[in-house]
Amino acid sequence: MSISHRLFKHGMVLLAATFIVVGCAMVPTDDIKISSESDPKANLKGYKTYNWAGSAALVYDPAGQWEPPEIDLDSEFRFLIDREMRAKGFTQSAANPDLLVGYVAGIDMDSIEYKKNPESKIKVLQNVPKGALVVVLIDTDTLFPVWAGEALAEVQKNITAESTKGRLDYAVSKMFAEMPR
């Protein structure tokens, strides 16, 4: 393979990576707050395998204004969590796993908070629906949680499927970045 062909090939890969990074940067994420907590007595490096404990998504949105109808959120959550677990060195195993993974996602449509009116600069009460995702890793021997991550965010109205996926990706990635391993 010639040098110019290799340079072209590497240049195209770099260009594609740049578009991916720039595309992800356009997804609004400044309202997403991440926190996590781990059991100080648990050695997360000692765990190797996991399996799913279950999940719950608590969203009632018949009009489809908060949850894009073309997205299966349960599948999206599982895909992202699986990806992060594998990136941390865990292997999924149905037979005798070290950890059980569970999550719950929900939306509080009645959340109210002070927001600054951009025209008058006065704070007023507004309905600001909030969404949350909590992921928990449970030791299968003790059945106690050893790590939990949480993402809280304002729910974006009439958001595209791509933006929703980008926000979820950001939240799950940041959540697992805080996991000691």
Language-model-detected regions and their locations in the chain:
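Bacterial N-terminal signal peptides that target proteins for export
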Residues: S2-L14
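N-terminal post-signal-peptidase region of extra-cytosolic proteins
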Residues: K33-S38, D82-K88, P118-I122
